[in-house]
């Protein structure tokens, strides 16, 4: 359902020893790089320890809802930050999908929201990520980090205590999958980061054993 069965199928293949390369994961590379680079800023380095919420918006053309790419993106964050699932992903009353994860005793809300989009081309594909937002809070600092899909680029911004401290853009690849397929053929070994992200993604959708 909503592409989530595919994630579990890939996970079973990886756990069975097969080498799996996923184009959706490759398409998330720029999203991952931009989000991670925001926290290289001296003011933001320690703010991930105070993360309170993760939100990912995905394209929903018509009524076609696909969540797998967003779940894999959240799974990557969970693997990097060593987050554990408290409440698996489930649909809320307002057509969003929510979950709760934790770092130690600190709980972090997760929200995946299908949205209508105006762009043409790749971003209109169901499940394409159009926005990712992280919010962190501690007694003397509030942090908001966003990566947003524009027409032909991704824009990353970070606001710390009301001040803009990061703003950078990166051009997007074309929608053609040929470069990703060629890259997959060139790789012969397991992708450790992908396997770790996939494991957390499967846990997020309800497999509490992983």
Regions found by a protein language model. Give the residues of each.
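Extended, well-ordered protein cores
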Residues: 1-49, 141-210
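Short, surface-exposed beta-strand/loop "edge" segments at domain boundaries and coil↔beta transitions
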Residues: 61-65, 106-110, 137-148
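Compositionally biased accessory segments in Actinobacterial proteins
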Residues: 75, 83, 130, 141-143
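ATP/pyrophosphate-binding catalytic subdomain of soluble kinases
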Residues: 28-100
């Amino acid at each position: 359902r909503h592409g989530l069965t595919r994630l579990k199928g890939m996970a079973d293949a990886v756990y069975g020893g097969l080498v799996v390369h996923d184009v959706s994961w490759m398409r998330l590379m720029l999203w991952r790089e931009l989000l991670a680079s925001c926290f290289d800023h001296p003011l933001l380095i320690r703010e991930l320890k105070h993360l309170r919420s993760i939100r990912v918006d995905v394209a929903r053309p018509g009524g076609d809802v696909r969540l797998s790419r967003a779940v894999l993106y959240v799974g990557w964050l969970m693997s990097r930050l060593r987050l554990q699932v408290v409440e698996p992903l489930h649909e809320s009353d307002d057509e969003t999908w929510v979950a709760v994860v934790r770092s130690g005793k600190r709980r972090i809300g997760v929200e995946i929201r299908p949205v209508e989009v105006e762009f043409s081309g790749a971003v209109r594909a169901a499940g394409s990520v159009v926005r990712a937002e992280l919010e962190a809070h501690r007694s003397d600092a509030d942090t908001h980090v966003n990566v947003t899909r524009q027409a032909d680029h991704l824009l990353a911004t970070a606001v710390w205590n009301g001040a803009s401290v990061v703003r950078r853009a990166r051009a997007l690849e074309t929608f053609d999958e040929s470069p990703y397929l060629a890259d997959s053929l060139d790789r012969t070994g397991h992708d450790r980061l992908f396997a770790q992200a996939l494991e957390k993604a499967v846990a997020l959708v309800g497999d509490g054993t992983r």
